[in-house]
């Protein structure tokens, strides 16, 4: 019997492309490879800014795979390409800002036993059993952003706080969410995802019980190799 495989959605393509690019940058940065350190320094300048404002970043944010057509998939339309490119720009520049001066990888993939979505990351900034209203308000403000440009600015503010606390994030998952955000009804979908992530923030041990907030995280110290 032949098993039919569902075609890869545009959002999945954005997420996978972001994951591959960010993982490569992170490996290079943590290995102190000069090209990766320089690339992240350039990308940081784009955090919170629109993709078209910094043409010199186009070579760093390679969207070429989006113009290809995987087996069983259809070519992306012009409107899909524009939204995908904008989502990748925001996600990669936010990752570059997040990773600055960190000795451990700030990008970690979200998993059922280790949530690393935006909501979970914000929740991890709070003490267990307490809701920090000031921090929570930042998530709410991001969720009510009127457009992608404002959302990028508000996410930038959140990422600065996450970096300060050494809290990881799945920036590739975020890239897919940013793609979805730009479509009618997409903001509602992403807000629901962030809300679920916020309430499922605990890491889980092998027996399924919640682990302590810091059990999975190796605390890092600052490095000045890219302090600019």
Task: Report the location of each language-model feature.
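Amphipathic alpha-helical interaction surfaces
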Residues: 49, 53, 67, 71, ...
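N-terminal interaction modules that seed assembly of large macromolecular complexes
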Residues: 23-90
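Aromatic- and glycine-enriched beta-alpha-beta binding-site module
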Residues: 66-121
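Short, extreme N-terminal leader segments that mark the start of a protein/domain
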Residues: 1-33
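Conserved binding-pocket/active-site segment within a compact domain
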Residues: 106, 111-180
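Alpha-helical oligomerization segments
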Residues: 163-228
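Helix-boundary capping/turn motifs
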Residues: 14, 32-35, 52-56, 84, ...
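Non-catalytic, well-ordered alpha-helical scaffold segments
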Residues: 37, 41, 59, 82-93, ...
